[in-house]
UniProtKB/Swiss-Prot annotation:
HAMAP family: DNA_mis_repair. InterPro entries: DNA_mismatch_repair_CS (IPR014762), DNA_mismatch_repair_MutL (IPR020667), DNA_mismatch_S5_2-like (IPR013507), HATPase_C_sf (IPR036890), MutL/Mlh/PMS (IPR002099), MutL/Mlh/Pms-like (IPR038973), MutL_C (IPR014790), MutL_C_dimsub (IPR042120). This is DNA mismatch repair protein MutL. One of its GO terms (cellular component) is mismatch repair complex.
Length: 629
């Protein structure tokens, strides 16, 4: 068969195979067109699951008469004009394929009127011929699109449609997803003349929360944790459910980028990683997240359905989302859920606002009425400076740099430690502790493990007790070693090294200080620098920006620690001791974890500081217990 150019009709039907998968795809494309037209009231009428009729009516800007036929042509749009527009997309649609593709597999009627016109006009097209007919009509300002007999000319496609109930369920889910990100827009969804969904404009807090509850359920709102996380051009907002509100299937996960619903592996991985320590592998988190970023940094022109995106800085986006969700889960700042309006008005800080782009948009082009997207992205005077308040903007959870995607499988060292842990003791070692004493330890101290693992030439670790202490043996003497005190000693030793390894923060922490706090900073700045902190100081604005931290403290709540150090009593303990006292000790669930800490601390010990370690050893006297036998 010779190579030849396909006819426009055949090309449109091929494109329809990508854009128009089922009736829900038609609804999505047409509702997005209505939103791009500036509509704040949209009605969706469905008959027989969308196979017989899909009608979308809006009060947007409308389409001028002279552009009606052009609207049905392929690759015709008012939303972009050049390559620069394509690389910075904020509109929901931009490809100019939807109406052409839909009209090629259905009987499509488009009726529209602009505010400047005194009468409306209607264009009709159907099937492969794509011939359009324009005639006057009666219609208010806005647009109505009717799609009748979907796939009437492609029987093979039509027979793949599911039952009316199933197809309408997909349409319902599309409307629910769109309604979650457009609080200021009213949506009405009907099926066979019956109102199924009706979302009124949600201007007030109580109305907005009711919409979220109507879509996600009251239980989700009651268990929701608010997120408002910012860094330069990045803004993460919305809600994540507490871990106890997990799902058995991934049916309550809504994510939007610049108002566009998306499915992205980078985002999914970041969310799953943030929940990893809270949820089992067969449970799914529930969330409604809005991500706003500079449109130059994300490519939405990846797939005709526009569900997939590609980030220019995937690791930055991944870690930004991970940090924001981790902070929300760690702090458990639950959303206040009120049904009484007077109570709601007293909680303005919880107001849910529709995400807005942080970029300047130049006036709209005439062809697109009030909502053509031709953005001009000027850097604002303080574009790269986070919003400041009396408390730091990025609290409590600091970045740990780029994260690798290693599996959670144990390393070879861990496997060797566990093998030794499970090894049967030699008879000579078993004689070191009497059977009676061992039984007494098990009954009174809740010993988790009684295997002996040699940690050094002097001390042997016998057991981890209540996840708080190590039972150690040296010759015939026994000692208890507090893991909390050991960890604080390890921090002090690590921060006293001549060369301290530093960890750059992916997202710097910004502090807005009072005059008293800034004076304290000037007093302690050398101390911070000595132990590996790197700040940028802005004395005129009483502001500090933390860029690097000592690697030993990279997982700590450094925002809390720094602020505590700047408000501490000057007559208290030394700076380093006071700082280590503010750090949060980890929980040791296995003997191997405790042994790693002990080994790391011993590595840092020298002849001059070994006394500090010796002072942590508390002798255990077995004689009173042996006398009772």
């Amino acid at each position: 068969m010779p190579i030849k150019i396909l006819s426009p009709q055949l090309a449109n039907q091929i494109a329809a195979g990508e854009v128009v998968e089922r009736p829900a795809s038609v609804v999505k494309e047409l509702v997005e067109n209505s939103l791009d037209a500036g509509a704040n009231k949209i009605q969706i009428d469905i008959e027989n699951g969308g196979a017989n009729l899909i009608r979308i009516r809006d009060n947007g800007c409308g389409i001028p008469k002279e552009e009606l036929s052009l609207a049905l042509a392929r690759h015709a749009t008012s939303k972009i004009a050049d390559l620069d527009d394509l690389e910075a997309i904020l509109s929901l649609g931009f490809r100019g394929e939807a109406l052409a593709s839909i009209s090629s597999v259905s009987r499509l009627t488009l009726t529209s009127r602009t505010e400047e016109q005194t009468e409306a006009w209607q264009v009709y097209a159907q099937g492969r011929d794509m011939e359009t007919t324009i005639k006057p009509a009666s219609h208010p300002v806005g647009t109505t699109v009717e799609v009748a007999n979907l796939f009437f000319n492609t029987p093979a496609r039509r027979k793949f449609l599911r039952t009316d109930k199933t197809e309408f369920a997909h349409i319902d889910e599309v409307i629910r997803r769109i309604a979650l990100t457009k609080f200021n827009t009213a949506f009405t969804l009907t099926h066979n003349g019956k109102i199924i969904r009706q979302y009124r404009p949600a201007e007030e807090l109580n109305q907005q929360l009711k919409r979220v509850a109507a879509i996600c359920g009251d239980d989700f709102v009651k268990n929701a944790l608010r997120i408002d996380w910012k860094h330069d051009d990045l803004h993460l907002s919305g809600w994540v459910a507490k871990p106890n509100f997990s799902r058995t299937q991934n049916d309550l996960s809504y994510c939007y980028i610049n108002g566009r619903m998306v499915r992205d592996k980078v985002i999914s991985h970041a969310i799953r990683q943030a929940y990893a320590q809270y949820l089992p592998t067969d449970a799914y988190p529930a969330f409604v997240l809005f991500i706003d970023l500079n449109p130059h940094d994300v490519d939405v022109n990846v797939h005709p359905t526009k569900h997939e995106v590609r980030f220019h800085q995937q690791r930055l986006i991944h870690d930004f989302i991970y940090e924001g969700i981790s902070y929300a889960l760690n702090n458990q700042e639950q959303l206040n859920w009120h049904t009484d309006q007077s109570a709601v008005e007293n909680h303005e800080e919880n107001t849910v606002r529709e995400p807005q782009p942080n970029y300047s948009i130049r006036p709209n082009r005439a062809a697109a009425g009030q909502n053509s997207f031709a953005p001009q992205y000027h850097e604002k005077p303080q574009q790269n400076q986070p919003h400041f308040s009396n408390t730091p903007v990025f609290p409590n959870h600091v970045s740990t740099g780029y994260r690798d995607y290693r599996s959670d499988a144990p390393s070879k060292i861990e496997q060797r430690l566990y093998a030794e842990l499970l090894r049967t003791l030699p008879p000579t070692a078993q004689k070191d502790i009497s059977d009676t004493a061992q039984q007494n330890i098990s009954d009174t101290a809740k010993i988790i493990s009684t295997e002996i693992i040699e940690c050094s030439s002097h001390l042997r670790a016998l057991s981890l007790i209540e996840n708080r202490a190590l039972l150690l043996q040296q010759n015939q003497d026994f000692f208890l070693l507090s893991l909390e005190k050991l960890q604080r000693l390890q921090w002090q030793l690590a921060l006293k090294q001549i060369q301290i390894e530093q960890q750059p923060l992916l997202i710097p922490i910004v502090f807005r200080l009072t005059e008293a706090q800034f004076q304290a900073w000037q007093q302690y700045s050398d101390n911070f620098k000595k132990i590996g902190f790197e700040f940028i100081e802005n004395q005129a604005q009483l502001r500090l920006t933390l860029n690097k931290v000592p690697s030993a403290l990279r997982t700590q709540n450094l925002q809390k620690c720094v602020m505590a150090m700047l408000t501490r009593d000057e007559n208290s303990s030394s700076f380093l001791t006071a700082l280590c006292a503010q750090l949060e000790c980890k929980t040791f669930n296995t003997l191997a974890d405790a042994l790693n800490l002990l080994s790391e601390t011993e590595r840092l010990l020298t002849q001059t500081n070994r006394t500090a370690f010796t002072q942590l050893l508390k002798p255990v006297n077995w004689q009173p217990l042996l006398d009772e036998i």
